[in-house]
Curated annotation (Swiss-Prot):
Residues 398-424 are annotated as: Disordered. A lipid is attached at C386, C388 (S-palmitoyl cysteine). Residues 89-102, 165-184, 260-308, 370-424 are cytoplasmic. The chain crosses the membrane at residues 68-88, 103-122, 143-164, 185-205, 235-259, 309-330, 349-369. The keyword Lipoprotein applies. N-glycosylated. Palmitoylated; this is required for normal localization at membrane rafts and normal GNA11-mediated activation of down-stream signaling cascades. The palmitoylation level increases in response to neurotensin treatment. The ligand binding pocket consists mainly of extracellular loops ECL2 and ECL3, as well as transmembrane regions TM6 and TM7. Residues 326-349 are annotated as: Neurotensin binding. This is Neurotensin receptor type 1. Residues 1-67, 123-142, 206-234, 331-348 are extracellular. The keyword Transmembrane applies.
Length: 424
């Protein structure tokens, strides 16, 4: 990707490099829009002629490659999340699920689906192919960034809430029966969406439509860009990074590590005792003592699989979201004087890579999180078989294996179906 000289930074460059004139509005204003969005990559450049200096000259091969990747992610993500939503909408399917994990999966599927439907088409149009003018009006500009940020917050918080649900179900199963009632889970998820909307409200006042043509009248100069000062936008970026990445990542990492350690201990105890009996202890006085769970050899393998899934959840979240937020924070912590021609070009290619990873998260979540719940996975595959006759025929050819429920001795009544759900 090569940028027109009128938008390059006049910072000190490497020896032998030709310096570029400092634009009228400065590089920082241009980077604001890039750092905030999946949208208009050139939205706040200073221009003399709207149809020349606003252009970011991405080579056609990069455009085609990014478009192909986006389309593949769009198809996989929309199909996976739509089937998940359809599965959860079936009353018969819900009756076969014993825990509240399906509420969290449904909320996550909805936020991922909205990200793919709302953000990806706009980005392909207004950043990859047509950089200017902004075609959706001032209300569309503000609404786009508001909805996109709200769905981003919702996805991150839904991933964290799912980790909380799994932690309670596995490490505190008796307490979970009380805390994770259906009504409380619905209220909790509703609170997540309300908080996500409130956190995204600043975008309604941060972004707006401006005409950056030389005379302020040329229709080709309309761009969706930050309309507030640089310091305010930096605060918005930093708050977004903390609430949509650092905070959820902390919860996910800690809780999934605790769960993985618990499952690992159960596997080791089962292996040592030979007959597959493990003891899960709790420190709560209400739950007191311990209970023994007889684990068959096949279930030991399932526990190991559960540990791998938990680690994959953490790794996927970090890999897909960390580069995206690092790219946005580049604007906050790199001064105008530090931007060179090479760094500026790197930023734009890095932009495409990080946003692709951002969408990978929404596309793989239906696959990754169906591994979290064995019961939900069975219902999901059953729904897919109903929607796809070819898939139904392949499933009929596969041998079916019956799995005996885990035996359990305790002073408390606890359903074996819930135990299977808890242990994946």
């Amino acid at each position: 990707m090569h940028l027109n000289s009128s938008v390059q930074q006049g910072a000190p460059s490497e020896p032998g490099a030709q310096p570029f004139p400092h634009p009228q509005f400065g590089l920082e204003t241009m980077l604001l829009a890039l750092s905030l969005s999946n949208g208009s990559g050139n939205s706040s450049e200073s221009i003399l002629e709207p149809n020349s200096n606003l252009d970011v000259n991405t080579d056609i091969y990069s455009k085609v490659l990014v478009t192909a990747v986006y389309l593949a992610l769009f198809v996989v993500g929309t199909v996976g999340n739509s089937v998940t939503a359809f599965t959860l909408a079936r009353k018969k399917s819900l009756q076969s699920l014993q825990s509240t994990v399906h509420y969290h999966l449904g909320s996550l599927a909805l936020s991922d689906l909205l990200i793919l439907l709302l953000a990806m088409p706009v980005e392909l149009y207004n950043f990859i192919w047509v950089h200017h003018p902004w075609a959706f009006g001032d209300a569309g500009c503000r609404g786009y960034y508001f909805l996109r940020d709200a769905c981003t917050y919702a996805t991150a918080l839904n991933v964290a809430s799912l980790s909380v649900e799994r932690y309670l179900a596995i490490c505190h199963p008796f307490k979970a029966k009380t805390l994770m009632s259906r009504s409380r889970t619905k209220k909790f998820i509703s609170a997540i969406w309300l908080a996500s909307a409130l956190l995204a409200v600043p975008m309604l006042f941060t972004m707006g439509l401006q005409n950056r043509s030389a005379d302020g009248q040329h229709p080709g100069g309309l761009v969706c860009t930050p309309t507030v000062d640089t310091a305010t936008v930096k605060v918005v970026i930093q708050v977004n990074t903390f609430m949509s990445f650092l905070f959820p990542m902390l919860i996910i990492s800690i809780l999934n590590t605790v769960i993985a350690n618990k499952l690992t201990v159960m596997v080791h105890q089962a292996a040592e005792q030979g007959r597959g009996v493990c003891t899960v202890g709790t420190h709560n006085s209400l739950e007191h003592s311990t209970f023994n769970m007889s684990i068959e050899p096949g279930r030991v393998q399932a526990l190991r699989h559960g540990v791998l899934v938990l680690r994959a959840v953490v790794i996927a979240f970090v890999v897909c979201w960390l580069p995206y937020h690092v790219r946005r924070l580049m604007f906050c912590y790199i001064s105008d004087e530090q931007w060179t021609t090479f760094l500026f070009d790197f930023y734009h290619y890095f932009y495409m890579l990080t946003n692709a990873l951002f969408y990978v998260s929404s596309a793989i979540n239906p696959i990754l999180y169906n591994l979290v719940s064995a019961n939900f996975r069975q219902v999901f595959l059953s729904t897919l078989a109903c929607l796809c006759p070819g898939w139904r025929r392949r499933r009929k050819k596969r041998p079916t294996f019956s799995r005996k429920p885990n035996s359990m001795s305790s002073n408390h009544a606890f359903s074996t179906s819930a135990t299977r759900e808890t242990l994946y």
